């Protein structure tokens, strides 16, 4: 398992407009191979938005980062200062603390 955390600011688009855009693209994420779950993030007070992705493997995450959806996000002129960081998951203790509920439901 791997987690990818992405965050960025919005520029030239309102939070409401952004939310409408992500509502329309969410189904594309649901079909990504190896994606267990994506949680969409928003902090309007600091203009910070993004997502937390749980992947079945590092390879699935890397394939996403080489794909059109990720490249499109990086090229989006309304998203500024995009930052991404990935982490391996300690699966045993994460299951104990219910950190992998989505994976268990799959």
Question: What annotation goes with each model-predicted range?
Answer:
Residues 1-48, 58-66, 77-106:
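Short S/T/G/P-rich N-terminal loop/turn motif that feeds into the first structured element of a domain
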Residues 71-76:
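A common structural junction motif
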């Amino acid at each position: 398992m791997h987690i990818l955390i992405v965050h960025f600011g919005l520029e030239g688009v309102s939070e409401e407009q952004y939310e409408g855009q992500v509502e329309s693209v969410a189904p594309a994420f649901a079909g990504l191979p190896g994606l267990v779950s994506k949680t969409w993030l928003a902090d309007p007070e600091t203009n910070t938005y993004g997502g937390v992705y749980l992947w079945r493997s590092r390879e699935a995450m890397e394939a996403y980062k080489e794909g059109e959806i990720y490249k499109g996000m990086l090229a989006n002129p309304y998203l500024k200062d995009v930052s991404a960081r990935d982490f391996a998951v300690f699966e045993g203790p994460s299951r104990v603390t219910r950190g992998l509920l989505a994976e268990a439901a799959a």
